[in-house]
Regions:
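A short, structural micro-pattern
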Residues: 11, 71, 160-161
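A general structural signal for well-ordered secondary-structure junctions
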Residues: 51, 76, 101-102
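Phosphate- and divalent-cation-binding pockets in alpha/beta enzyme and binding domains
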Residues: 65-66, 87
Length: 162
């Protein structure tokens, strides 16, 4: 989402659908003054072809209705999960703390690690993915939910981990 502000006007916000593979914008939707991107995202999804694609959305857009719309249009989704979904975030967080689970996920090959060096620091991201979600009480509320992923991010600057 980006903002645009002219003198003496309130800023306008725009939700954009971006194709990483092709490197261009597929569509945009202005966010109405007394609204937010939660209402603009479904309207934008209605206007663009997404069949067979994977849609990624930040935590604010992680809504059951948005997931439903994506699945109805025969696409898949990766949605960021934070505290805006009741106990689901805490449930998932606790699950990934289970003893030996992260090692087991690595051994199954459902793990990826990336490192980037910038601004005299090293950023390491580790991703752990599992399809073991039968225990997740909210699973049925999210059409097409197949797996959960945990991202573990660490920063190292001058040899000190943050």
């Amino acid at each position: 989402m980006c903002a645009n502000k002219r003198k003496e006007e309130k800023p306008s916000h725009i939700v954009s659908a971006w194709s990483k593979e092709d490197g261009f914008c597929l569509g945009q939707k202005a966010v109405e003054e007394k609204s937010n991107e939660i209402t603009a995202i479904p309207e934008l999804l209605e206007k663009i072809q997404i069949k067979g694609q994977v849609i990624t959305i930040d935590a604010m857009g992680t809504q059951k209705g948005i997931a439903e719309k994506i699945k109805k249009k025969r696409a898949d989704y990766v949605l960021a999960l934070k505290g805006n979904q009741g106990t689901m975030f805490e449930d998932v967080k606790e699950y990934f703390k289970e003893k030996g689970l992260l090692k087991e996920i690595q051994e199954k090959g459902c793990y990826k690690k990336t490192q980037e060096k910038a601004h005299s620091q090293i950023e390491t991201r580790e991703y752990y993915q599992t399809e073991d979600i039968g225990w997740l009480g909210q699973k049925k509320e999210w059409r097409g939910l197949k797996s959960i992923v945990m991202e573990k991010k660490t920063l190292e600057k001058d040899g000190i981990q943050k």
